[in-house]
């Protein structure tokens, strides 16, 4: 517990096991910082790194609400559905707006902001597989209009998910959504 006081997952540790890193975005950052390659995944300048951080931070509320929402789909409440809808709209509309001006979320090249976006949004889109449970409780899936409402965000998700480096890790996550 010294290295990781919260004891939650996901978690990563320094090679000697002395330092624990927890939470997905922190693990993304640590992985890129530890890389010996200059691949630009955390931006190329300090300001680009801060912009990447901004998108990762904006995704935190979305990710937290999505976790609560997805785990409770069978007993969804009006409040939970409304909170998730607001978090979804805020996050995905910001991504869509950013993609008006460049091909990637935070900078002009692929960064961990894009990786986090694909992973978080891909996970959330699984709600569509639970449409029957939602309808039974009087709700529609929040993401039903994703393709039309946020076309740039949708195209970005699907184009990145089709790339081998994403497809190899996503597997069948986006199948049927």
Feature annotation, model-predicted:
Residues 1-85, 90:
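GST-like domain detector, emphasizing the conserved glutathione-binding G-site
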Residues 10-11, 89-104:
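Short amphipathic alpha-helical segments and their helix-coil junctions
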Residues 32, 36, 120-121, 170:
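Active-site-flanking alpha-helical
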Residues 37-38, 97-108, 131, 163-170:
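Surface-exposed helix-capping loop/turn segments at secondary-structure junctions
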Residues 52, 105-140, 144-152, 160:
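GST superfamily/GST-like fold recognition
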Residues 60-63, 92-96, 157, 161:
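Structural signal for well-ordered, non-membrane alpha-helices
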Residues 84-95, 120, 153-156:
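Alpha-helical packing segments of well-folded alpha/beta enzyme cores
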Residues 143-177:
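Long hydrophobic alpha-helical segments typical of transmembrane helices together
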């Amino acid at each position: 517990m010294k290295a990781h006081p919260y004891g939650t997952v996901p978690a990563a540790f320094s090679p000697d096991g002395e330092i624990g890193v927890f939470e997905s975005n922190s693990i993304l950052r640590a992985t890129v910082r530890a890389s010996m390659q200059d691949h630009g995944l955390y931006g190329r300048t300090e300001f680009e790194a801060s912009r990447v951080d901004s998108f990762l931070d904006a995704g935190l509320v979305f990710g937290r609400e999505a976790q609560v929402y997805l785990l409770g789909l069978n007993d969804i409440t009006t409040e939970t559905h409304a909170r998730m809808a607001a978090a979804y709209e805020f996050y995905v509309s910001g991504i869509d707006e950013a993609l008006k001006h460049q091909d990637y979320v935070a900078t002009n090249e692929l960064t961990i902001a894009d990786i986090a976006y694909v992973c978080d949004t891909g996970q959330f889109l699984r709600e569509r597989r639970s449409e029957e449970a939602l309808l039974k409780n009087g709700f529609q899936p929040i993401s039903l209009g994703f393709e039309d409402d946020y076309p740039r965000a949708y195209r970005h998700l699907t184009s990145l998910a089709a790339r081998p480096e994403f497809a190899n890790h996503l597997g069948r996550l986006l199948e049927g959504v």
